[in-house]
């Protein structure tokens, strides 16, 4: 566990008191007050955690002295309470260390989730549909709102590609480790011989970006308007309402045709474009820091095989943390996914805490 010195604890608490004093000044202008309030909201929980650590350390020192008391009964009581104190202190120091870690600025954001069928043809598309249901139900369990942005349905069911937005507090923090290749092993409905096939789908989770996050020059966009088409290429709309936006500098292309309104299709396409550009910048910054910390959990490489869903064995294995759970139905149903995600978050926290020791 990270050893946090008494001087550092005192400095954290002192900074909170400095902020309180400055915010109480009558001559403080509103812009400065907003900035100080934002810092205070970040410092206050850390200061409370620091005070808790300090209190438990003092309590531990007192109990340690009592274990040497001449009274055997008092000594025995102190030994027992000291064990409880050590456990509480370890938990408090971990909580404080976690609060001191740099936060991912995108954690509290909503997210754009994209699923694309990979190897496996029709079976991969069906699996893409399974993943969509899993994430949609997981979102519902957490009280988040799911909105379909675009979908390319496959003829036998499922999706060749589907994009949804998931809106709520902390969505990205919970789902960001889902990016990567998800593999399924099962007997396809089209398989008459009963042989197990392996198929795959790629998941990408992007933090939702606001207009202020990404500066997009209209002159960098090429916008094409065309007629919507359904499976097999048949026209599904008599008006030119589908929109394709190309961001020329990056080469990113986003198409949207699910809405009957050209205006709504353009708005949805811009939402996805902003998210992709924002994520590209995040990836650039991440790669610059990659030499400082190699993460097994949060690499975010979408070509990395991260998880296998084995139907014959009822097994789900996350390869990044060697986690295997024989609870496939519950996980694909949505609620069971929490156990996997919580394990990934715990591993990421452990890695980041260890990096503070380096």
From Swiss-Prot:
The modification N5-methylglutamine is found at residue 234. GO terms for molecular function: translation release factor activity, codon specific. InterPro entries: PCRF, Pep_chain_release_fac_I, Pep_chain_release_fac_I_sf, Prokaryotic/Mito_RF, RF-1. The keyword Cytoplasm applies. GO terms for cellular component: cytoplasm. SMART domains: PCRF. Keywords: Cytoplasm, Methylation, Protein biosynthesis. The keyword Cytoplasm applies. Pfam families: PCRF (PF03462), RF-1 (PF00472). It is found in: Cytoplasm. PROSITE patterns: RF_PROK_I. Residues 283-306 are annotated as: Disordered. Methylated by PrmC. Methylation increases the termination efficiency of RF1. Its main location: cytoplasm. Belongs to the prokaryotic/mitochondrial release factor family. Peptide chain release factor 1 directs the termination of translation in response to the peptide chain termination codons UAG and UAA. This is Peptide chain release factor 1. The lineage of its organism: Bacteria, Pseudomonadati, Pseudomonadota, Alphaproteobacteria, Sphingomonadales. The gene is prfA.
